[in-house]
Curated annotation (Swiss-Prot):
InterPro entries in alphabetical order: PCSK9_ProteinaseK-like, Peptidase_S8/S53_dom, Peptidase_S8/S53_dom_sf, Peptidase_S8_His-AS, Peptidase_S8_Ser-AS, Peptidase_S8_subtilisin-like, Peptidase_S8_subtilisin-rel, S8pro/Inhibitor_I9
Protein name: Subtilisin-like protease CPC735_015300
GO molecular function annotations of the record: serine-type endopeptidase activity
Major place of residence: secreted
This protein's record includes keyword Secreted: yes
Role summary: Secreted subtilisin-like serine protease with keratinolytic activity that contributes to pathogenicity.
Keywords assigned: Glycoprotein, Hydrolase, Protease, Secreted, Serine protease, Signal, Virulence, Zymogen
EC supergroup of this enzyme: hydrolase
Amino acid sequence: MGFIKTLSLSLAAASAANAAKILSPSRPDDVIPNQYIVVMKDGVSGEAFGSHRAWVSDMHHTNLTRRALLNHGIKKTYDFMRMKGYSGVFDRDTIKDISQSPDVAFIEHDHVVRLTELVEQPDAPTWGLGRVSHQEPGNMDYVYDDTAGDGVWAYDIDTGVDIEHPDFEGRAVWGSNHVDDDDTDGNGHGTHVGGTIGSLTYGVAKKVRIIAVKVLDARGSGSNSGVIAGIDWSVNHAMENNVAERAVINLSLGGARSDTTNMAVANAVQAGLHVAVAAGNDNEDAENSSPASEPTVCTVAASNINDQKASFSNFGSVVDIYAPGEEILSLAPGGGTQTLSGTSMAAPHIAGMGAYLIALENITASAACDRIKELGLEVINNPGAGTTNKLTYNGNGQ
């Protein structure tokens, strides 16, 4: 009897030791209750992945039926590059059972993701385009090559885009929606970002194709799982259309540091896309947030008109480049314009710059961030501890 009891305890301990880790959230207040993201181990086949999801669905249905709870379970599935996984709403018993699966690498609490904009200031000057095309500050003219991002696709993963805005000249199209059933930009943030990437008047790359991928609602809020779904869709869409090496992604959003979000954007880079990410607006080390903390993406801090770090901008060794991010004029839904500040406004300068250089120099998208850093001007005053002082520049010689 003693032997059997000891053996049972040993097996239970071994099972617990081999269970997939449920990662602790870095910002507990942002956790979405009972919502999780599950990431599979490398090498899990498509067939095994399908069988695992079927097992989870059956098991969870049984658990919830027993408690008279419905409308839970798997909500989104991810399958791109080396990342296979899913997200959904699960009870505690189901998550415990999932963690025991030998196919699961780790589990993460889903959490809220927000915009990285700050404020709107009416009638602010347009200075960003002039700054990124001149070696000295103070020039308002934008000097650029007429290739202007022609043939490059830009995935604007945000609040949606007003694709009918005349300043997009018909180059903006709707891609996918991972947050609600409203295929419009009810917030305005995504339209502003898209305008900086590639609109006729305010865009860095004035001939780029803009693809709206909605992951945040009209309040500017969404979930980590929704953002990952948007990245998943964008990467697969670019690969299916054979444009991954001539495609860019912009992510002017952020949340708590997340292994799953960082894995998703790293997969996008591995697929060949140029990924520009806002550093964040907390005046702290960007190492603490995602996707800004992922080393393989192009993480962008914000500068002001005086070539200084914007007071709100995050900083740190993960920052690759500075770009204009204070009082940036761009598009608003309904055919108008608006002025916004934030690293949300800096990142699309780098998405647009990536598109511009891909078309101009015929480089691959995966080489764009390094090229942007090579061209950068060492002019930022007080960039922050351990942070580059390089400001983006398009290299036209002016």
